[in-house]
Amino acid sequence: KDEGYINQLAQTFCDGQLYESLHSMLTENEPGSSRRSNLYYNGKIKGWSIDFNADALWTDTKNKQTAQESVSGSVNHHADRTVTTHDTKRNELYAAKLVVSHPVPKGELSLGAEYSHNKRNTTYFNAEGIIGNDEAMIKEGATSAFVEYVKKFNNLQMQAGLRYEHVGFNYYDAGKWVAEQSKTYHN
């Protein structure tokens, strides 16, 4: 468990006089976990060159921060308060790419596909209600397919290809899909 401690003093002056003094003592901890996985293959099967790579990553962090604040000055006189926040983040990432290629007369033909998916959940909660709470989720995904032909002319090389890509981004606020911030593209 990683734990941090911050002790800070902020003072505001107006016309050379102390207007407000804010003393904050913060403690925070960030326990978390991370897991990752990778799978790959690079080789040949019946004259086809195959290059495959896939990754997965999962992270989970939780942070609790407690601030003991003491405010004094000519406007507020003296006030003490505790501000407690809980912040959680969860991430999932999956990505894969496959390229297969084969020699053809006077060149090489390659076919491939890519895929990625990312999901992020965040929550922010203030027990005392001093700071607004927040809960958001983002889902991103991309899928593509491509074909490419390569031909060599002595020291020169010519490439021609086509690629199609679908990209989606979805944003959720407190569990509700937000259309204005969610986008989809087909290229």
Residue spans of the language-model regions?
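Primarily recognizes Gram-negative and organellar outer-membrane beta-barrels
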Residues: 1-187
